[in-house]
């Protein structure tokens, strides 16, 4: 007899790669990026970039982005309210203080060599690049009332460029369950438990 099918309420499905750059030789974060691509969410599909960069330490000065960029503003607000409520590493940096900035996104993949997402807003272009995928594996976590599963791809290198200028900073390896502070996350699903 076949096993019964169990259905669970899905809160979001898509991708969520991240980049965290540190001041060289330290644990001080200088750039923090969380890039969401929702194929499904209760507020529709789209992309939302949550980003914080220290103006001085990143070397980006007055161009250092802090905030949310989105092609679906409701998605950016939904992601912030539902998935970052207990994530101290990103909270308190001012990301949520302004409304989401309207933006367009372009994605290019070079297999295991690189993955690039460009975010273009009125006066700002933010380019995110993950390079040299080290491995792919499935990870399942239970954080903040959700079960999350994803296909993770920790990377050996990453770069964040704003208006053509590369942010200073280095990734950490190993770090967390992804093994790198620059990691791709495909087929990511969050369900409430």
Residue ranges and their predicted role:
Residues 1-193:
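Targeting-peptide/extracellular-domain and disordered-appendage signature
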